[in-house]
């Protein structure tokens, strides 16, 4: 099911788009009037606008955590494996320059040192 915030954002965008017909704009106005023109949560940032600062606090209050996906040990180990694999692949990829390969090797050594 579509996110109500996205639906509202789409109708708001239609109102400010000069390429949208007056008929479509009127339907958008009607929808926003019937369903409310304010979305409870923002859908992210667009064109450099900042998301509502209160959103994270509201989500925490409602029981949604803001835990980083790599905070638990299993996920952290999996991520580390992906990082190591990426550096190894860069070291053996013929399209990567010698400088890039050396840099990947240095970073791989750093990652290995940190994981010990």
Curated annotation (Swiss-Prot):
Nucleus in keyword set: yes
Polar residues bias (residue ranges): 39-48
Stretches for region Disordered: 32-116
Pfam families assigned to the protein according to its UniProt record, in alphabetical order: Con-6
Major subcellular site: cytoplasm
InterPro entries in alphabetical order: Conidiation-specific_6 (IPR018824), UPF0654_domain (IPR052670)
Name of the protein in question: UPF0654 protein C869.09
Compositional bias annotation for Basic and acidic residues: 49-64
Localization, UniProt: Cytoplasm; Nucleus
Alphabetic keyword roster: Cytoplasm, Nucleus
Family membership noted in the UniProt record: Belongs to the UPF0654 (con-6) family.
Biological source species: Schizosaccharomyces pombe (strain 972 / ATCC 24843)
Signal peptide limits: none
Record-level GO cellular component terms: cytoplasm; cytosol; nucleus
């Amino acid at each position: 099911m579509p996110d109500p915030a996205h639906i509202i954002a789409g109708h708001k965008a239609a109102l400010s788009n000069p390429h949208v017909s007056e008929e479509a704009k009127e339907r958008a106005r009607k929808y926003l009037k019937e369903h409310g023109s304010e979305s409870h949560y923002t859908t992210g940032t667009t064109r450099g606008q900042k998301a509502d600062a209160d959103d994270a606090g509201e989500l925490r209050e409602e029981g949604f955590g803001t835990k980083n996906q790599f905070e638990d040990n299993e996920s952290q180990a999996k991520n580390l494996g992906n990082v190591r694999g990426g550096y190894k692949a860069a070291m053996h990829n013929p399209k990567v320059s010698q400088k890039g390969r050396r840099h990947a090797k240095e970073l791989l050594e750093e990652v290995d040192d940190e994981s010990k």
